[in-house]
């Protein structure tokens, strides 16, 4: 029997399930009317197989909520380009109230973007959407793309939602350095986990992911400061647990954890995950 997860792109189907479930709630904090179609039956099966993620679906809800807010914040600040790396099945260019003049560039592997284009064929994005099919692991292609986009925009926000945990430290450092070389890439938002949460996630979800040769890797001990040598200054980080608590998405047990004081980062010797925003130190703001 084929494994449920066959490649890294299948994780996008898995995550889409949680966006669909949140969207179905009467008190939903965001609405993604396309998520269930995109997840498909396989997405549901994957989510069911990874019980730990089902029990902690609040983390995915909080992440989507936080990234939605970061996008809207930067649009309000006059950012004219959003570049979504490893975009997967993201539908923000269709579901959010974005300016029609906003340029939205999504980059991911050909397979997942072709699948999304097929499902979304009858839908119309609200902004200027460009889909670029490219393997971000290919350094030559990646650099060429970044240089091209860097010349074409003056004020871009980069988002890499759900990507960093799959990189190793060298890959994360190279990506950070490549991005910071483009002065017009003013800010970068991504989610990060602490070493303690990485170990927990590897234990609870690792066996299912391993079938598809997918491994959780990246959780720098120095937290956000890992990125300073590569041109990125931390601005703010939002705890997913604290966010989920304010959204009333936690179980009673998790509410007790959320009520505890959370020590300031960037070094966090406890299970933690959050959405982090960085400023390009090579940019003239």
Task: Pin down the residues of each PLM region.
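C-terminal lobe and adjacent flexible extensions of AdoMet/dcAdoMet transferase-like proteins
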Residues: 270-285
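A short SAM/SAH-binding and catalytic strip from SAM-dependent methyltransferases
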Residues: 155-170
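Conserved beta-strand signature within the Rossmann-like core of class I S-adenosyl-L-methionine
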Residues: 157, 182-195
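A short, conserved alpha-helix within the catalytic core of class I
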Residues: 139-142, 166-182
């Amino acid at each position: 029997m084929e494994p449920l997860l066959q490649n890294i792109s299948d994780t996008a189907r898995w995550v889409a399930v949680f966006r669909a479930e949140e969207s179905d709630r009467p008190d939903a904090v965001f609405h993604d009317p396309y998520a269930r179609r995109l997840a498909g039956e396989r997405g549901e099966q994957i989510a069911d197989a990874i019980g730990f993620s089902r029990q902690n679906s609040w983390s995915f809800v909080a992440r989507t909520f936080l990234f939605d807010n970061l996008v809207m914040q930067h649009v309000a600040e006059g950012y004219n380009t959003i570049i979504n790396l490893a975009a997967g099945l993201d539908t923000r260019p269709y579901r959010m109230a974005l300016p029609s003049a906003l340029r939205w560039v999504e980059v991911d592997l050909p397979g997942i973007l072709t699948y999304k284009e097929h499902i979304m064929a009858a839908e119309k994005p609200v902004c200027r959407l460009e889909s670029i099919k490219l393997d971000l692991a290919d350094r030559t292609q990646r650099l060429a793309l970044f240089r091209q986009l860097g010349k074409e925009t003056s004020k871009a926000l980069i988002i890499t939602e759900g990507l960093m945990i799959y990189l190793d430290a060298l890959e994360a450092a190279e990506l950070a350095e490549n991005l910071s070389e483009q002065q017009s890439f003013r800010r970068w938002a991504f989610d990060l986990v602490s070493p303690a949460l990485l170990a927990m996630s590897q234990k609870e979800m690792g066996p299912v992911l391993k079938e598809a040769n997918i491994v959780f890797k990246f959780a720098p001990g120095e937290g956000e400061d890992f990125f300073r040598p590569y041109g990125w200054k931390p601005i703010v980080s939002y705890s997913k647990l604290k966010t989920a608590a304010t959204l009333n998405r936690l179980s009673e047990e998790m509410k007790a954890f959320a009520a505890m004081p959370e020590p300031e980062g960037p070094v966090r010797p406890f299970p933690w995950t959050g959405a982090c925003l960085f400023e390009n130190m090579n940019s003239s703001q």
